[in-house]
Amino acid sequence: MLSGMEKQPAMLLVLVTLCAFACKRSVAQSAFATFYGGKDGSGTMGGACGYGNLYNAGYGLYNAALSSALFNDGAMCGACYTITCDTSQTKWCKPGGNSITITATNLCPPNWALPSNSGGWCNPPRQHFDMSQPAWENIAVYQAGIVPVNYKRVPCQRSGGIRFAISGHDYFELVTVTNVGGSGVVAQMSIKGSNTGWMAMSRNWGANWQSNAYLAGQSLSFIVQLDDGRKVTAWNVAPSNWFFGATYSTSWVQF
């Protein structure tokens, strides 16, 4: 057993690790923002995270496509950011310095045919948010087209439990994880059938995680771990008669 003196360095390491993540999230950084998807935001549905209908996924219209410098090959799907129009840099901000919190749901790809400062807004290494129009119009005037912003990563507030949409076929389960609170970013996942042990899953693309086990006829449990190290276990969230194409959720498993 560790003595009190021996425990202190270990506890300090944990606190420093947690602080490093929290402090990084709380520091505002500069970027630019545009908008897409139409006035009703319908053009933002789907996207490179694989969420499909963003209402069903728990994310709604306040979303954005991230430049590749922020998107990180899909690893940042589900992250939440507070975005504020930078009134010191432009006259096109809405009065009052309004901020909006959005969820990362898509990739804004590079456009190498255009210069980075004239149309190629999402070209690396630019940090850029292509926001849904409804989200954009909370902070900036429509006619502006593009504005400088300040952003910082913030915790995600979600209603209800985490959702697991299962697609695939025998020996291949592709699970899309949505409505994730806390940091919002899934870093690791594991799956367990009622007749198996825990098996690590791998990210296939976006928010889609895969397993190559035959799990038909078994209830399914999942461990979801976020990029801040927090994790939850959703025991038997999918019953033994689960089927491909269905979404399963819990009201009690959330960050």
From Swiss-Prot:
One of its GO terms (biological process) is plant-type cell wall loosening. Its main location: secreted. It is a peripheral membrane protein. Transmembrane segments: none annotated. Expressed in the epidermis and vascular cylinder of the root tip, lateral root primordia, adventitious root primordia, shoot apex and leaf primordia. It is found in: Secreted, Cell wall; Membrane. Residues 46-161 form the Expansin-like EG45 domain. GO terms for cellular component: extracellular region; membrane. InterPro entries: Expan_Lol_pI, Expansin, Expansin/allergen_DPBB_dom, Expansin_CBD, Expansin_CBD_sf, RlpA-like_DPBB, RlpA-like_sf. This is Expansin-A3.
